[in-house]
Amino acid sequence: MSGHSKFANIKHKKEKNDAAKGKIFTIIGREIAVAVKEGGPDPSNNFKLAQVIAKAKSNNMPNDTIERGIKKAAGDGNSVNYEFCTYKGYGPSGTAIIVKCLTDNKNRTAANVRNAFTKGHGSIGTQGCVSYMFDEKGQIIIAKEDCEMDADDLMMIALDAGAEDFNEEEDCFEVLTSPDDFEAVRSALEAENIPMAEAEVTMIPQNYVELSADEDITNINRILDLLDDDDDVQQVYHNWDE
């Protein structure tokens, strides 16, 4: 792999997350509540909850906070009902953007997302307009500076657990899985005490779009910043080659 430093992107995202950790924890708390209501409080029998817990751990959410969130969701029948919704559209120069939200008011969320695209001279598209440009994969990033294990041994653990691919970059290792095999692979790495800088099911662009015009870069950053500031937005995926 070349041209896209996964760990550099993760570090950049972590820096932004650390500046708004309260928001990140609130977002994950909502996801925990929805996952528990849909599938129960036992992550061994609730794949969605297991995924959210993995996301929480990769964002350094304390275990007691995770456990409190699960217990609260399991015992609270009067909490706010949140719904997942997804918006897809285009940024400058045909960049593709997918926005995943968790909201208690779809009308509010739709208006806010549309406003973000409009202010960055982008547009919301039809429901399936950019999906074909991404692959849904489990992605685990392991920083070399945090991992003492030999690359070959690490690769064997991942592949034996069901990983589809193992890639090495200058600063990190990337493990890719199918969404269904993600938790098994993540658990296998965790059992070996392998530190993971990122572990989640994500949307990976098949190709990246380079933006050279300053106006395009300003506009896509405006879209992404407005979406990042929206409490209803859970995750944003794009194919801009930052």
Predicted regions and their residues:
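N-terminal cationic and glycine-rich segments that engage phosphates or anionic surfaces
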Residues: M1-G125, C129-I141, H238-D241
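Positively charged, low-complexity, intrinsically disordered RNA-binding extensions
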Residues: Q139-E242
